[in-house]
């Protein structure tokens, strides 16, 4: 490391020791986790009955009525560029008319996209013609260029949260960011206020603030709430150093070190700064129009009701342990709660003396808690719910990505491929202890659960270090409970054509416009 390197490291708020440790991790890799089983209904996954659904909804509404602070936390830094990979490919293709199935589907259904009118305006502005005429002349690439490039809507560079997703009428077309504001009013508001926090990239912060300034009052009036909307950026101190294939630091063409964002696991630092009793976490692109929100609202309240019910019990037990007024029978009751309700087991628990048992139970009860919605596996990419062995020998529930599983272990691969459920990033978190003090969330990260990915820059291969994922290793030492939620609550948008699914059509049959489906010219 030369002086320029050290200055670069210091400017990011990273220590030299951290860099050395990161390079060591890149060199040695990370251990695979030891698995006991894939979680399933009755084995780590709750499936509430209709009566239980009502009871948990009621528990959540009672909790809200007590005036607790609730925050909806939305990771929203993702750029939309990957959504349009196929359309970028069309722009650079040697042909000019839709050829692949994806391209044909896009153009045949262009009238169904919520951004259609805005795109038509840009086409008229830049080409002197609307979408219909351009397509009629075979000028399909002009339409796509106006969608993706800076001269047009610039969707190739915008964050996903600011794209037009759902069209309700000619005057109301919503972005995912707006849909999250609506959701916050419907299940995450208390005392007439809805707190929403978006994590965004630095380049997009002003755009998000501008959209909030334009829209927040409209939704506040519509739903009768006061919005408190805040933003944060991923901290430069969570960036990780890139390495060459020989594990030496990768350097840019000017000789400087290359740092890369550490992945969504870096957001544990942002989550740690949220002052709230309960925090909902959900990805920016998993939203539906109002006509399909009922299931989402119901099951968000259910998982939140389960969280506060379990937390209340854990707090009662911690206060009891503090008081000293308990007998062995009471300790056995607490063991049952930890094992059955919190799904955390220890093989040698019967061998512990009461004094050791109290230390163990206190440690397991007094930590952050999360309840995660999981949906039936339908082949979508995503983390799976597993029972895994922890560093202290206990077995508990974790959300694992494929990179954390030893693909050479046939038994583990069978668990992964035959797992009945997966996690669509649907979490509700309790981040304060039984004394009302916030937990320091970085203390509960398992640093051995990062992973190394292969990337390239300027045609040169490099190794990138990803931090433990936010809902994976970053929450490894939390109490975790899984609850089955309907598949209807999971509607991510990974490609632009996903917006053509019925689940993303705000009005069945589409919004009729003057002059037909497309814009007027």
What does each model-found stretch correspond to?
Residues 407-410, 432:
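Long insertion/accessory domains within large nucleic-acid-processing enzymes
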Residues 133-137, 151, 155, 285-287, ...:
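Conserved catalytic alpha/beta cores of large enzymes that bind or transform nucleotide phosphates
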Residues 7-9, 13, 28-31, 35-378, ...:
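Domain-scale recognition of functional cores that engage charged ligands
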Residues 1, 222, 520-521:
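Polar low-complexity intrinsically disordered regions
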Residues 181-185, 409-412, 467:
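Short amphipathic beta-strand starts and helix->beta connectors
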Residues 193, 368, 381, 422-424, ...:
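A general secondary-structure signal for short beta-strands and their flanking turns/coil
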Residues 1-24:
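Intrinsically disordered, low-structural-confidence terminal and linker regions
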């Amino acid at each position: 490391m030369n002086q320029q390197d050290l200055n670069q490291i210091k400017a990011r708020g990273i220590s030299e020791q951290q860099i050395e440790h990161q390079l060591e991790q890149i060199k040695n890799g990370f251990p695979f986790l030891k698995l006991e089983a894939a979680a399933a209904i009755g084995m780590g996954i709750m499936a509430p009955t209709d009566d239980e659904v009502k009871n948990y909804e009621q528990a959540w509404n009672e909790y809200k009525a007590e005036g607790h602070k609730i925050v909806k936390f939305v990771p929203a830094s993702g750029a939309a560029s990957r959504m349009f990979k196929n359309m970028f490919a069309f722009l650079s293709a040697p042909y000019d008319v839709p050829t692949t199935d994806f391209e044909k589907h896009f153009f045949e259904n262009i009238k169904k996209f919520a951004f259609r009118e805005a795109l038509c305006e840009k086409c008229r502005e830049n080409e002197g013609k609307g979408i219909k005429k351009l397509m009629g002349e075979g000028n399909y690439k002009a339409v796509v260029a106006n969608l993706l490039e800076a001269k047009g809507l610039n969707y190739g560079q915008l964050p996903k949260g600011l794209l037009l997703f759902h069209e309700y009428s000619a005057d109301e077309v919503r972005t995912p960011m707006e849909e999250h504001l609506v959701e916050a009013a419907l299940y995450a508001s208390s005392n007439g206020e809805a707190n929403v926090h978006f994590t965004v990239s630095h380049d997009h912060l002003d755009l998000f603030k501008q959209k909030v300034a334009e829209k927040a009052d409209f939704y506040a009036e519509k739903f009768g709430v006061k919005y408190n909307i805040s933003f944060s950026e991923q901290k430069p101190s969570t960036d990780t150093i890139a390495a060459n294939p020989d594990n030496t630091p990768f350097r840019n063409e000017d000789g400087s070190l290359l740092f890369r964002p550490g992945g969504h696991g870096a957001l544990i630092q942002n989550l740690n700064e949220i002052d709230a009793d309960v925090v909902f976490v959900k990805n920016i692109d998993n939203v539906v129009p109002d006509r399909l929100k009922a299931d989402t609202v119901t099951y968000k309240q259910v998982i939140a009701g389960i969280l506060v019910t379990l937390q209340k019990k854990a707090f009662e037990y911690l206060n009891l342990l503090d008081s000293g007024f308990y007998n062995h029978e009471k300790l056995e009751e607490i063991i049952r709660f930890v094992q059955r309700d919190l799904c955390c087991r220890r093989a040698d628990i019967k061998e512990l003396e009461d004094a050791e048992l109290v230390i163990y139970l206190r440690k397991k009860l007094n930590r952050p808690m999360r309840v995660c919605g999981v949906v039936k596996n339908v082949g979508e990419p995503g983390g799976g719910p597993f029972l895994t062995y922890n560093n202290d020998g206990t077995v508990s529930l974790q959300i694992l990505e494929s990179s954390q599983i030893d693909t050479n272990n046939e038994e583990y691969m069978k668990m992964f491929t035959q797992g009945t459920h997966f996690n669509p990033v649907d979490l509700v978190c309790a981040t304060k202890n039984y004394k009302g003090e916030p937990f320091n969330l970085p203390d509960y990260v398992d640093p051995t659960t990062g992973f190394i990915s292969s990337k390239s820059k300027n045609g040169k291969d490099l190794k990138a270090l990803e931090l433990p994922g936010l809902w994976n290793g970053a929450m490894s030492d939390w109490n975790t409970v899984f609850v089955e939620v309907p598949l209807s609550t999971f509607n991510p948008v990974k490609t632009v054509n996903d917006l053509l699914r019925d689940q993303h059509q705000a009005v069945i049959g589409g919004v009729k416009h003057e002059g037909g489906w497309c814009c007027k010219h």
